[in-house]
């Protein structure tokens, strides 16, 4: 619970300081979703997924029937109401990984097949409910969950089965959450440092400098053995 509260507070305070607004960013979404889905972690995995699917369905019905599209679209990440939708991603990932971790041997093929099937289900459902990131539609959530599961499986094959090690990714993974939080700070410094008279390449420069700054922080943390947990 502490981690989710801290994520929400980091996001809330950071947005207030950086943008002087009460917008709903990624960190607020992560914190609120974690707190909302916390009770689901105390029930069997299958029940947890079913409950999160029910939550996702309720959100989509409310979105379509109660005229909430404009309200939700006004926030980044869908705002507080979209917590009902994001809950499925967290519940599914925690439940599926939790079940496999308890086994002596993890079967990555199940994750890969499951990811492809879920992504396909999300794609097919988009013909009924269009994929919409701003509204955090159910098709978007299901499709994204499938893609994330597939990517996780491929990474597992590459690292755990194939034995590949990529130093930069390893460093980023060891402090992924704190690096993500600090990325907004790095981005702010980059925007101040770069000249404003480069309209064409400005977004590219910001992206490259921010990415480079985050990688540099991750490498420094890894070399000094610093691992920050929330």
Where are the regions a protein language model picked out?
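Alpha-helical transmembrane segments and their immediate juxtamembrane cytosolic regions
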Residues: 1-230
